[in-house]
From Swiss-Prot:
Organism: Saccharomyces cerevisiae (strain ATCC 204508 / S288c)
Top-level taxon in the UniProt lineage: Eukaryota
InterPro entries: Spg4 (IPR020485)
Record-annotated disulphide pairs: none
Ranges of Polar residues composition bias in the record: 25-37, 50-66
Record-linked Pfam families: SPG4
Anything else known: Present with 259 molecules/cell in log phase SD medium.
Lineage: Eukaryota, Fungi, Dikarya, Ascomycota, Saccharomycotina
Protein name from the UniProt record: Stationary phase protein 4
Function: Stationary phase-essential protein not required for growth on nonfermentable carbon sources.
Span list, region Disordered: 16-77
Family, similarity comment: Belongs to the SPG4 family.
């Protein structure tokens, strides 16, 4: 005859917690840390050496038009300009913020939800 606690026994004990793997996230066995990527935010990885973030960040003093002129002088069109991944929006001008915002929405469908 079994005890009262036998009613709460787990049928397949290997399906649940195993004492040999306590203490960490063991679902992501292929990498050392969890990586989250959403499809609409995906960008191709850079092939050239990453520049210094300070050199990538545009000055908040300059206007949008002057920065576009500098890019054209360097031979880059405004659509081809690299956009930094981590930026401090508190130091950006309104034009710089709008350019960054629009570049992140590139490729999304134009429907009422996204307007």
């Amino acid at each position: 005859m079994g005890s009262f606690w036998d009613a709460f026994a787990v049928y397949d004990k290997k399906k649940h917690a195993d004492p040999s793997v306590y203490g960490g996230n063991h679902n992501n066995t292929g990498d050392s840390k969890t990586q989250v990527m959403f499809s609409k935010e995906y960008r191709q990885p850079r092939t050239h050496q990453q520049e210094n973030l300070q050199s990538m960040r545009r000055s908040s003093i300059g206007s949008q038009d002057s920065s576009d002129v500098e890019d054209v002088k360097e031979g880059r069109l405004p659509a081809e300009v690299e956009i930094p991944k981590n930026v401090d929006i508190s130091n950006m001008s309104q034009g710089e913020f709008l350019r960054l915002y629009e570049s992140l929405r590139r490729g999304e469908p134009d429907n009422k939800v996204n307007r």
